[in-house]
């Protein structure tokens, strides 16, 4: 790189994002449990919509995403004018940082929070502020103490990735009420559908003018390969985000498939119930062999080992058995492995392999 050609401040401080592994050298048909994907895939209705979309590939997609926005609004009881759609919830996070953060401002998030918060903050030249958690759970008081007149955005995944822990409505309300006047609370609800009865902050959004929610179709809807997400918030904020959103940021295929997916809530309910059953089973099975985890409300558990060496050794053993899980040292949890909840056979297989590893120690 020429000394005269330099990127904007903060860009070179960004560590390249590393996604979950998808294969193991020398192993055919390895079972991927590293990216929190739905083992049952998308709704059959979503698959049908995907196939139908091939007949209009020569046409530009809509610029206002009206069909998908109205479908989301109908399912969740929202105002469609306050829904914004993006290329995964990542793009909504990026929009928020582009619109409200920048040099000499702070973006706050928790120490084990989603890595994209730091990346998006640095990309706009903002100062990332990492706040300690308490036993791998959000500490509202610590977040409030970290806020200053420079704070513009506070990102909180609830349930959190990679811990699976979450805080209740009272704590969320206290956090929103305690933020500086210029700050926006962004509630990342990527895993909200896995929590029965949880509104992901919708009530707070209606009560206050400083709360925005992001959601994704990559998890329970099984559309990770398509990259579709959405956000909801005060009309004034959504209007700002739409001003920087590209007019054709989502393809017709993305829009029509996601619309069919969100309308099939029977599929969502089945996936949620199956996930809850096997999440509890796997957590209990691992606890019985000395591998604890916090109560997870998402579609994964964070298995804790005695130290980094044991976690890495277990990961290597799992790979020899054709099982791919996620190391989370990048989240400051080097002694842990994040394990996606698969179907029954997958959960039994990973529990057996970890038990085998523990017996060999």
Curated annotation (Swiss-Prot):
MF terms (GO), sorted A to Z: histidinol-phosphate transaminase activity; pyridoxal phosphate binding
Enzyme kind, highest EC tier: transferase
Source superkingdom: Bacteria
Keyword Amino-acid biosynthesis applies: yes
Metabolic or biological pathway: Amino-acid biosynthesis; L-histidine biosynthesis; L-histidine from 5-phospho-alpha-D-ribose 1-diphosphate: step 7/9
EC number in record: 2.6.1.9
Sequence positions bearing N6-(pyridoxal phosphate)lysine: 219
Alphabetized Gene3D superfamilies for the sequence: Aspartate Aminotransferase, domain 1, Type I PLP-dependent aspartate aminotransferase-like (Major domain)
Keywords, alphabetical: Amino-acid biosynthesis, Aminotransferase, Histidine biosynthesis, Pyridoxal phosphate, Transferase
Cofactors that this protein relies on: pyridoxal 5'-phosphate
Biological processes per GO annotation: L-histidine biosynthetic process
Catalytic activity: L-histidinol phosphate + 2-oxoglutarate = 3-(imidazol-4-yl)-2-oxopropyl phosphate + L-glutamate
Quaternary context: Homodimer.
Family to which this protein belongs: Belongs to the class-II pyridoxal-phosphate-dependent aminotransferase family. Histidinol-phosphate aminotransferase subfamily.
Record-given protein name: Histidinol-phosphate aminotransferase
Gene: hisC
């Amino acid at each position: 790189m020429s000394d005269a050609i330099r990127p904007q401040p903060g860009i070179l401080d960004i560590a390249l994002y590393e996604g979950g592994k998808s294969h193991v050298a020398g192993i055919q048909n390895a079972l991927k449990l590293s990216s929190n994907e739905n083992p049952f895939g998308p709704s059959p209705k979503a698959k049908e919509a995907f196939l139908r979309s091939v007949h209009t590939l020569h046409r530009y997609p809509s610029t206002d995403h009206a069909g998908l926005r109205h479908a989301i609004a109908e399912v969740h009881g929202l105002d469609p004018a306050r829904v914004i759609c993006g290329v995964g919830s990542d793009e909504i996070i990026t929009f928020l940082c582009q619109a409200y953060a920048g040099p000499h401002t702070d973006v706050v998030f928790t120490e084990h929070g989603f890595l994209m918060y730091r990346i998006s903050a640095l990309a706009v030249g903002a100062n990332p502020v990492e706040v300690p958690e308490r036993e791998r759970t959000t500490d509202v008081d610590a977040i409030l103490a970290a806020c200053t007149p420079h704070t513009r955005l506070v990102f909180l995944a609830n349930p959190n990735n990679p811990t699976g822990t979450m805080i209740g409505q009272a704590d969320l309300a206290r956090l929103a009420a305690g933020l500086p006047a210029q700050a926006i609370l962004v509630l990342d609800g990527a895993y909200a559908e896995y929590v029965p009865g949880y509104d992901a902050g919708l009530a707070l959004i209606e009560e206050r003018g400083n709360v925005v929610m992001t959601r994704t179709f990559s998890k329970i809807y099984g559309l990770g390969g398509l990259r579709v997400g959405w956000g909801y918030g005060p009309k004034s904020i959504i209007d700002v985000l739409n001003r920087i959103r590209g007019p054709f940021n989502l393809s017709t295929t993305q829009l029509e498939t996601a619309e069919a997916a969100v309308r099939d809530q029977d599929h969502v309910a089945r996936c949620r119930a199956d996930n809850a059953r096997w999440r509890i089973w796997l957590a209990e099975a691992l606890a019985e062999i000395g591998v604890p985890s916090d109560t997870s409300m998402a579609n994964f558990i964070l298995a804790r080992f005695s130290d980094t060496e044991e976690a890495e050794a277990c990961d290597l053993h799992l790979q020899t058995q054709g099982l791919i899980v996620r190391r989370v040292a990048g989240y400051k949890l080097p002694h842990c492995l994040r394990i996606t909840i698969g179907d029954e056979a997958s959960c039994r297989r990973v529990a057996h392999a970890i038990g085998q590893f523990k017996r060999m120690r």
